[in-house]
Amino acid sequence: MKIQREIIETSDGSKTIHLPEWNENYHSHHGALQEAKHVFLKNGLDDFVHQKEISILEIGLGTGLNAILTCQEATKQDLKINYSALEAYPVSEEELEALNYQSFLEDEFARSHYAQIHSAEWNQRQTISPNFSINKILDQLENCNFEKNQFDIIYFDAFGPRVQGELWSLEIFQMLFKSLKSNGLLVTYCAKGQVKRDLKTAGFVVECVPGPPGKREMTKAFKRDL
């Protein structure tokens, strides 16, 4: 599937990709960087830093922003993170250059790691740093069947249910629930009522928390021991 994509600037100065056909962005127009940090680091990774070794699945690698921010945190907090990222329609080198996320990264190591994440081979785990490895999975979520009890955290960063409703189905959430370890967490920017109801039906304990700039709420869904 060929999707038209264009680069736009968000409110915090960082850029994102806009899909005119769907009127959908890869990140919030209120701030790509702010959204990624708030949703996936503050309300996702931070819940697990006590573990020191963490397994993460990202649904929607996209620009790689969540991956590189997580890689940076792994170094800062001396964590070992095994990261898996699913992507069906990879971003091109030209688009990555136009996004210029390297300008927001803190040091040369982070900029180098960001380039390594995008140059890594698909469908095989590669070490990016002593603290971070990644397996980029080139496939559609509907085709996946992950092992049970595999992940501590799922970054659910797919396009919204308005444009990709098939990715937000009860069947998908049931499959992801099984893939999480006990007390694992699925975190997403989306707070729509139907999504939360389906997450609960799939077995999750759902919690609404304040969202990033421009969003009142976001969702955390836990796999709790009964």
For each feature predicted by the language model, list its residue ranges.
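A short glycine-rich, Lys/Arg-flanked "PGG" loop and its adjoining helix->strand segment in the class I
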Residues: 167-183
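Glycine-rich SAM-binding Motif I of class I
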Residues: 64-68
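Short SAM/SAH-binding signature in class I
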Residues: 134-136, 150-158
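Rossmann-like AdoMet
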Residues: 1-54, 72-105
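Conserved beta-strand signature within the Rossmann-like core of class I S-adenosyl-L-methionine
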Residues: 153-155, 182-190
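Conserved beta-strand/loop positions that form the S-adenosyl-L-methionine
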Residues: 57-59
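S-adenosyl-L-methionine
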Residues: 97-147
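Core SAM-dependent methyltransferase catalytic element
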Residues: 202-226
